[in-house]
Design a protein with these regions (language model features):
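A short helix-loop-beta-strand connector motif used in the catalytic cores of GNAT acetyltransferases and
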Residues: 62-75
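Conserved GNAT acetyl-CoA-binding A-motif
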Residues: 122-135
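A conserved short alpha-helix in the GNAT/GCN5 acetyltransferase fold that borders
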Residues: 106, 115-123, 147
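Conserved active-site alpha-helix within GNAT-family acetyltransferase domains
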Residues: 112, 137-155
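A short, well-structured alpha-helix characteristic of acyl/acetyltransferase catalytic modules
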Residues: 1-61
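Conserved beta-strand in the GNAT
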Residues: 74, 82-95
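C-terminal "cap" of GNAT-fold acetyltransferases
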Residues: 156-167
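A short, internal acetyl-CoA/4′-phosphopantetheine-binding micro-motif in the GNAT/acyltransferase core
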Residues: 76, 95-110, 135-136
Length: 167
């Protein structure tokens, strides 16, 4: 159940940046390939501020929650004419959690490409504002990604800041 009353696209295309071609593919209930992303302590720390790997049960609960709150997508990159999942993102007006699961792809602008496309999605849906519920102070990559897209911190939280973008 994505956003109430809104039909979630199967695919959201993202404009190519240099040699990088991405797309967002609608969550279909299959996520075993993503488990390895959530085993990496550095990745988990960026998400939770902790380093304990996710169990399959926890991963399933996370994806079920996200799928019931917004439009859940896998971020896919085109490699050798094949679409390969490299992360996930969920879009709804109140939050936009994103994970680039492949650590070798972080810092290359993939997150910015995804966030720009989801800002466009928000505009298509007529939203006047978009929010990020919280970015931990230690997650400099995520802070940089959302700031680059125009999001501004507006409220301090226990571990970081809430962000808002006026559309």
């Amino acid at each position: 159940m994505p956003i109430s009353g809104i039909c979630q696209p199967e695919i959201l295309s993202i404009p190519k940046k240099g040699s990088i071609q991405l797309r967002l593919r609608k969550y279909d209930g299959s996520f075993n390939f993503a488990w390895s992303w959530y085993q990496d302590p550095a990745t988990v720390r960026l998400i939770d501020g902790k380093t304990e790997p996710y169990s399959m049960e926890r991963l399933e609960k996370m994806y079920t929650y996200l799928d019931h709150h917004g439009e859940l997508y896998f971020i896919e990159i085109l490699r050798d004419d094949q679409w390969v999942p490299v992360g996930d993102v969920t879009f709804w007006q109140e939050d936009m959690p994103i994970v680039i699961g492949d650590p070798t792809l972080r810092g290359m602008g993939l997150g910015s490409m995804v966030v720009r496309r989801l800002i466009q999605r928000g505009q298509e849906l007529g939203y006047k504002q978009l929010f990020v519920d919280e970015i931990d102070d230690c997650n400099t990559g995520s802070k940089r990604c959302f700031a680059k897209a125009g999001f501004k911190p507006y409220e301090k939280t226990e571990k970081g800041w809430k962000y808002r973008l006026e559309l």
